[in-house]
Structure formats: structure tokens, C-alpha cells
Amino acid sequence: KLGSIVDIAKKYKEDGINPFPENIDVVTGGFPCQDFSIAGKRQGFQSKKTHQGLMAEAGTPSIESRGQLYMWMREVIAITKPKVFIAENVKGLVNLGDVKEIIEDDFRNIGDGYLVVPAKVLHAGEFGVPQSRERVIFIGFRRDSLKKEAIRELSKDRINNIYDPYPKETHYLPNAQPEFFKTEFVSVRKALQGLGEPEDSDDPAHQAYSKAKFMGRHCQGQIEVDLDGLAPTIRAEHHGNIEVSR
């Protein structure tokens, strides 16, 4: 059932009926990024927007504010008790005061305790995605689902490659020094070649294009994509006026 995670978790607390399936192994989620992104006002935990995206009537932050919705993902993890959880957000969260450390600690204190490895920023382009997209990833393991050796290794400051839960980069980025065990980045041209022409499709969505004006290099609005490089970050709201010339 779709709905606000706040409303779903609150209803569970009120009537005790678990809305989630049993025996969940993995919970994944991306809590709202607007209050952490360098493209926004960066209000972080002090966001005055509600979980519905509206201005709070009192005008003050609360546990239901948009900037604190990771706490409700935390509630879902506490309810479902998955063996593993993965959360993601924008890179800007990392350098917004001690926000990253606070979120890591809050995730560690779920129920009987989760082992949360240090969050890490991953670049999509280093994994063969033709897009310049960086996201910070949080990973946590339910302690009773791990062997003692795994707990010991995952608790170290420098985790051995065998136990490191983060994937290894497979591609090197544009302008980076080529590496023997990595493949060249996937360019926009390589990803799009072979696609049919928009006018050959019966889907109106394939023929629509933006008429917005170029807004300068300070943002990605109406910029022309470098076909031999990586595309800018594709945004979740499906706009941003990114132009690919044919």
C-alpha cells in the first residue's frame, strides 16, 4: 500500500497491526534529499517542510519534518527487523556539519542494535552508468545475523576487502588516469547509440521536448550534454531540461 511512511509507521504504533510482510531480509530506501542537497537551502534537520512537502503550521522543525524522515525509515527497520538495510542520499549530506555521524548513530541504535559500517560516497560513473551521479550510501547489518568473525571485521576502521560490503569500482571516470583493472567509463554516446529516432515512435512522450532557455553553467538547466562524456545527474522529478543534440 502506498502512503507516507510517517502515517504507516504511526498507524502501526496505534493499532499494532504490522502492514509489512514477514521475514524481510533487506530494507532499502532513499529519504528526502532536498534539505541536504547543495542545490537547496540546506536546512538539514531544521527543515520546516512537513513529510507531505508543505510548510509546517508552527513553522518549527519536528520529528515529522522532511529533513528528519530518515527517522521513519529507522522505524520501519525496527518493525521489520531485516538482516540488512541500505539507505541513500545526496553527497551534500556528508559535509553538512555532523549530520552523517548523527544518522549513522541513530541507525546503530535500532532495537537490539545494528552494525552500521561507515557511510561511503559512490559515483555512478565508476560502475558503468553514463551519468555523473554521486550518492552517499548507509549500510547496516542486524548483529544476530552475522558470524562473530564478520562482526569483528566489519567493526574495524579499515575493513578487509573480503568483508567490505561496498562494491568495487569497475570503470574509471573521464579525465582520470586509466587503471589496469578498470574499464573506460560508458559515454552518453555509447549508451544512446542504436536507439530509434523520436519521430519514428507513436509514443507522444518520445516526441516532447523542452522549450526552456539556457540558464547558465551554475546549474544543469538546459545544458547540452557532452555525448563523449557523462550526462548530468538525472533528477527524480523527471525535469531539468537537459538537452542531447543529434
Task: Give residue ranges: language-model regions.
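SAM cofactor-binding core of SAM-dependent methyltransferases
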Residues: K1-V6
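Class I S-adenosyl-L-methionine
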Residues: I8-I24, Q34, I38-L227
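Glycine-rich, N-terminal phosphate-binding loop of Rossmann-like dinucleotide-binding domains
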Residues: F31
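Internal helical hairpin/lid segments
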Residues: F214-R246
